[in-house]
Amino acid sequence: MLAQTGACAFVYGVPFLVPTLRDELGLSLAEAGTYVAAPTVGLLLTLIAWGAAADRFGERRVMALGLGLTTVSVGAVALATPGSPAAVLGLLAVGGAAAASVFAANGRMIMGWFPRTERGLAMGIRQTSQPLGVALAGLVLPGLAQRTGAFPALVVPAAVCLVAAVLVVVVVRDPARPPRTAEGAVGTPYRSPVLWRVHAASAMLVVPQFAFSAFGTEYLVRQQGWGVAGAGAFVAVVQIAGAVSRIGSGVWSDRVGSRLRPMRQLAVGAVLVLLVFALGDAVAPWLAVVALAVGGIVTVADNGLAFTAVAEIAGSAWSGRALGIQNTGQNVASSLTPVALGALVGVTGYAVGFAVAAVAPLLAVGLTPVRDEQEPSW
């Protein structure tokens, strides 16, 4: 869990540097979005490969190697910031590529250690690492960036990743797995459209999540007149509440015996909260702040459900690769959302931009294959 928290504090913590980055480098919102997107671009390019490595070599080795590489690349940005923007973007992308090891491997580990009736809760707890990582970044990075500069503030997630790498080597053990001959006889689960639909729905649900997380701090500072530290603390508190919501949705799915029914209902909630934010920005600023708080909770609650469903549908032999594909789709969406939505908001304003973003979770409602959900094979 510490490994995932540290990786998330880096990959998803860069948005908290946006106000300082824009002041230091004179960037537009869309240009700042490229720095936000760089770690997730690196991450999405390697997730499937890390997943295949976890299927082949085990989770412990994959996570230890990836966390070590993350520490080196992010530490290079923090402690010896290159003068070239391209070099900084490259190192951020390499850091994201290395952090992908954690995203691809630790979900598979949880599926191996927990029975089906407890996986929703276990995966929900695992998925709290993302909002907790974002909360850590929100509490620490904005204020630290104002004192040290934007990039040196990344020393914090680099240090967390270093500690996590050591703990993985010392503490973590891979779960038992079926004999390789039995795994090799299993065909691909991608012959059915069910997994593809879950992947697509999950990618659509990333859009509202990143609409709020990538632009929440910026909106409060630029549009509402909040201080940077206060805005970061607000987002951090919301992220902690979002972490609790992921556990709650996991328990919910265990009790109803379905991952996909709760996932679809949360997609409906994401549509509504985006539209409420758009309305608030247009006519009632206080309502927009409320929607930011609620949206930061609702739009992250579904994530663990999708990951659990994907791993259960894929089966033991394919779960690492399937989770890699799942993460890739989500991170394609998370890479594109800050740039595309930033450009749209820059032209139309937040109300129109977030109303357009509501189309994504609306598509997810239809894509989620609730009727095709079956008992897992492992």
Report residues per predicted region.
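Extracytoplasmic gate region of multi-pass secondary transporters
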Residues: 14-15, 194-239, 243
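C-terminal ends and interior cores of transmembrane alpha-helices
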Residues: 68-82, 269-282
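Cytoplasmic helix-loop-helix junction between adjacent transmembrane helices
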Residues: 91-130
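Helix-loop-helix hairpin linking two adjacent transmembrane segments in secondary transporters
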Residues: 126-172
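Helix-to-loop junctions at the C-terminal end of transmembrane segments
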Residues: 46-58, 246-258
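C-terminal transmembrane helical hairpin of 12-TM major facilitator-type secondary transporters
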Residues: 259-306
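Residue-level signature of mid-helix packing/kink "hotspots" within the transmembrane helices
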Residues: 12, 40-48, 135, 239-243, ...
